[in-house]
């Protein structure tokens, strides 16, 4: 595994709270999948906040949470009060559950929310290949993706006035740490990366090393197999992010930062 695993999340409660702030945006897919879907598999479910939010709203559906962090899964299971939620620390254990409860994989949708960038930050090359194999070849009817992501053309010179605003209002040492890991913020791609990251001061030693933007929009699209067709696509800036960056630096982010894909199995 990556050396980043030597920098664990120092405050799981704060981490989970941060992740839950975009909860409404994360459930964008629920009105876009057809009624043959009986099971949602939430890959990288953390403490289960997302599916515990959905479970009472859709009592006829099953929500399965997976996270390789066993402490997260323990928290999720301990907090769960819904019979239509189950949690696993192995991504393939749910297949046994499906067979035991007589659900087909073609009745399942895979939700991958804010996970792809973590896979690339914390995994070996082989583990990344295994991840995409799981995504493409398990047989899910839908693959749902939401993550931080920029277009390839975001690599361009940063605006001089934006650089001045950042360097005048943030720790020079922290900026230097970021640039040592990810490159100069004179590249607009890296500047936006920094603006996605700067707020996480409590977990900074972990967060500064994590690559939030390892994959461009175009790259992610290229990783989905030919057996799936694109059903939905959206690329935007989260209003919360735009507002907080404007407040803290008086900078208007001009590139879309969060992408959503829904792919459907052909045939």
Predicted regions and their residues:
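Active-site catalytic pocket residues across diverse enzymes, especially alpha/beta-hydrolases
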Residues: 58, 80, 123
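Short amphipathic alpha-helix with an adjacent loop that forms part of the alpha/beta core around
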Residues: 94-105
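A short, conserved alpha-helix within the catalytic core of class I
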Residues: 119-135
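Hydrophobic adenine-recognition pocket in adenosine-nucleotide-binding enzymes
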Residues: 115
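A conserved beta-strand element that flanks and buttresses the S-adenosyl-L-methionine
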Residues: 111
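Class I (Rossmann-like) S-adenosyl-L-methionine-dependent methyltransferase catalytic domain
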Residues: 1-55, 66-84, 88-95, 138-267
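A general structural motif
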Residues: 35-37, 60, 104-107, 140
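Conserved S-adenosyl-L-methionine
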Residues: 56-62
């Amino acid at each position: 595994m990556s050396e980043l695993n030597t920098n664990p999340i120092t405050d799981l409660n704060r981490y989970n709270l941060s992740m839950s702030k975009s909860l409404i945006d994360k459930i964008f897919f629920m009105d876009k999948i057809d009624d043959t879907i009986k099971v949602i598999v939430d890959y990288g479910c953390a403490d289960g906040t997302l599916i515990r939010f959905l479970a009472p709203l859709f009592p006829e559906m099953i929500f399965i949470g997976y996270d390789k962090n066993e402490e997260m899964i323990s928290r999720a299971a301990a907090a769960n009060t819904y019979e239509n939620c189950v949690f696993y620390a192995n991504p393939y254990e749910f297949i046994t559950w499906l067979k035991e409860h007589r659900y087909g994989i073609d009745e399942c949708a895979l939700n991958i929310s804010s996970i792809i960038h973590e896979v690339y930050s914390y995994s070996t090359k082989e583990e990344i290949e295994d991840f995409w194999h799981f995504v493409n070849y398990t047989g899910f009817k839908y693959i749902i993706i939401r993550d931080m992501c920029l277009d390839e053309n975001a690599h361009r010179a940063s605006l001089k006035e934006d650089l001045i605003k950042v360097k005048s209002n943030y720790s020079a040492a922290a900026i230097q740490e970021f640039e040592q890991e990810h490159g100069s913020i004179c590249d607009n791609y890296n500047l936006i990366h920094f603006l996605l990251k700067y707020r996480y001061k409590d977990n900074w030693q972990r967060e500064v090393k994590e690559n939030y933007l390892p994959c461009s929009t175009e790259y992610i699209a290229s990783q989905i197999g030919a057996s799936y067709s694109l059903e939905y696509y959206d690329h935007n800036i989260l209003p919360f992010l735009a507002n907080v960056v404007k407040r803290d630096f008086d900078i208007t982010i001009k590139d879309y930062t969060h992408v959503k894909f829904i792919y459907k199995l052909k045939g």
